[in-house]
């Protein structure tokens, strides 16, 4: 690993011609940690310990593919002239919202096939997802991407950041806002809140709470970033999607409480699709 002033090599190590990047290692660690945390939640509601294996496997694969497609779509003017770069996901360039869409769709399909209740599974994995996202942002840090606008070294020192973060925010002769860190901290706080409140919330509300919490933080952090995917010259895609997710989640939670009076998560027990108790 090559570490010099202001630079941490994105490549952790090489195996012959194969470069193993910190980006992939960190994302894999986030997924694994999230899986083990979700395993404990499975036991609490009486579901089998292997329930999430297929869901996480397919959601991770489809999520990564859709996340890349999402990113490439909004950067098509570049990729249309660099087609060989499209599959090089290890260089970075995936969009969390794309991954969320792909993971959500595949997760619902697997729940249907496995006869699982999607809201219950969503509540189980929501804290793990936001924690994995918070950890994954450190992959952006290692790749020297997803940072904010220029700042001074004095500004970063005023934040009392560790020296290795300050050094690695020195990119091509300029210090930048560590927006990866802002979002990572926000996500970890969200993880603690969701884990703490999950038992008190109605079925499905932990997942929608995740969407709301993540989207609020992403909206404000995105305004600081210099590499946003743009819908128009003034509209950032991530901010627009965040607003839509907040609105949908709030409306859905209110509607379900008024219309259906859903049961509490802690009282749900093992549920099947759509809401029948498993025998």
From Swiss-Prot:
A 1,2-diacyl-sn-glycero-3-phospho-(1'-sn-glycerol) binds at residue 137. The chain crosses the membrane at residues 22-42, 52-72, 89-109, 203-223, 235-255. The keyword Transmembrane applies. It is found in: Cell membrane. Pathway: Protein modification; lipoprotein biosynthesis (diacylglyceryl transfer). Its main location: membrane. The keyword Transferase applies. One of its GO terms (molecular function) is phosphatidylglycerol-prolipoprotein diacylglyceryl transferase activity. GO terms for biological process: lipoprotein biosynthetic process. GO terms for cellular component: plasma membrane. It is an enzyme of class 2 (transferase). Keywords: Cell membrane, Membrane, Transferase, Transmembrane, Transmembrane helix. Belongs to the Lgt family. Catalyzes the transfer of the diacylglyceryl group from phosphatidylglycerol to the sulfhydryl group of the N-terminal cysteine of a prolipoprotein, the first step in the formation of mature lipoproteins. This is Phosphatidylglycerol--prolipoprotein diacylglyceryl transferase. It comes from Staphylococcus epidermidis (strain ATCC 35984 / DSM 28319 / BCRC 17069 / CCUG 31568 / BM 3577 / RP62A).
């Amino acid at each position: 690993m090559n570490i010099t002033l202001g630079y941490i090599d994105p490549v952790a190590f090489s195996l012959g011609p194969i470069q193993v990047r910190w980006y992939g290692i960190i994302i894999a660690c986030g997924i694994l940690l999230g899986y083990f945390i979700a395993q404990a939640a499975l036991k609490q509601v009486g579901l089998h310990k292997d329930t999430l294996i297929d869901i996480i496997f397919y959601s991770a694969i489809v999520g990564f593919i859709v996340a890349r497609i999402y990113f490439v779509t909004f950067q098509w003017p570049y990729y249309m002239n660099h087609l060989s770069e499209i599959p090089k996901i290890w260089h970075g360039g995936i969009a969390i919202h794309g991954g969320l869409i792909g993971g959500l769709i595949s997760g619902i399909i697997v729940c249907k096939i496995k006869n699982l209740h999607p809201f219950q599974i969503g509540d189980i994995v929501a804290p793990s997802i936001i924690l994995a996202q918070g950890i994954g942002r450190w992959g952006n840090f290692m790749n020297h991407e997803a940072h904010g606008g220029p700042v001074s070294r004095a500004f970063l020192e005023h934040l009392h950041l560790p020296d290795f973060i300050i050094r690695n925010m020195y990119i091509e002769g300029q210090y930048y806002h560590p927006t990866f860190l802002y979002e990572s901290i926000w996500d970890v706080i969200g993880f603690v809140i969701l884990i703490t409140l999950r038992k008190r919330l109605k079925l499905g509300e932990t997942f929608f709470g995740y969407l709301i919490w993540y989207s609020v933080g992403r909206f404000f952090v995105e305004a600081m970033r210099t590499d946003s995917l743009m819908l128009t010259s003034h509209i950032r895609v991530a901010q627009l999607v965040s607003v839509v997710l907040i609105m949908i989640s709030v409306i859905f939670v209110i509607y379900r409480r008024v219309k259906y009076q859903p049961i509490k998560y802690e009282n749900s027990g093992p549920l099947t699709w759509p809401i029948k108790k498993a025998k």
